[in-house]
Structures are given as structure tokens and as C-alpha cells.
Amino acid sequence: MIKLRLKRFGKKKEASFRIVACNSTSRRDGRPLQELGFYNPRTKETRLDTEALRIRLTQGAQPTDVVRTLLEKGGLLEKKVRPSIAIGKAKLEKEKIAKAKSKEAESDSKEAES
């Protein structure tokens, strides 16, 4: 299986990354099949080879989570709603509604006592 992942390079504590296509069993900094882009997390600079990335994605290459977010920002992939995020938002909304109801109940009970 071909993976799209980040390959680290640069000085110590000043890492930059190349976006590469490689075999899923190869090492992080091993020899890639193809270099597809560049990402610098300090300056947020991103360069993508869009044609080569589209070809690799149509061939079935699987991007890692970080590469997926970079491709979403670059417009190559649609933003995918991850289930854990959607569940977390729904849970927060339910908690807000429950708090509002409990505050209403407290204010009603205080008015009844007066």
C-alpha cells in the first residue's frame, strides 16, 4: 500500500518536511517513491505538486492525518467531518441545553419560594 506521508529533514529543532509517496512498510526517512511537496511548520509554508498528488490519490494512495489536513487546505481533498469531532460538538450542545434548563428550573423555584 502506498502512503502519502511527511519525511523530516533540516537542522536539529528546525525541522522541515517533504511530502512523499512511499511504501507503508518503509521507514520515516527512507527512500521515497516520489517527492510531492514541501511543508515548513515554522513559517506555515506549503508547496504542493498538485498534478502528481492527484495521480497518486487516484491510484489509491492513503494520506496520513497531517498530510490529509495539508491537502484539504490546499484544495485537493474535500474537508472530511471526522466522527469524533461531530460527536463532541453534539455532546457540547446537549450539555448547554441541559445547563440552560437547570438554570431555568432554579430561577423558577426561587420565584416560587418568594
Swiss-Prot record:
Gene Ontology CC terms:
cytoplasm; small ribosomal subunit
Q: List the Pfam families hit by this protein, alphabetically.
A: Ribosomal_S16
Query: Which InterPro entries does the record match to this protein?
Result: Ribosomal_bS16, Ribosomal_bS16_CS, Ribosomal_bS16_dom_sf
Which GO molecular-function terms appear in the entry? structural constituent of ribosome
* KW Ribosomal protein (keyword) present: yes
Its GO biological process annotations read: translation
Which PROSITE patterns does the entry link to? RIBOSOMAL_S16
Q: Name the SUPFAM superfamilies on file.
A: Ribosomal protein S16 (SSF54565)
UniProt keyword list: Ribonucleoprotein, Ribosomal protein
The similarity annotation says:
Belongs to the bacterial ribosomal protein bS16 family.
User: What is the protein's name according to its record?
Assistant: Small ribosomal subunit protein bS16
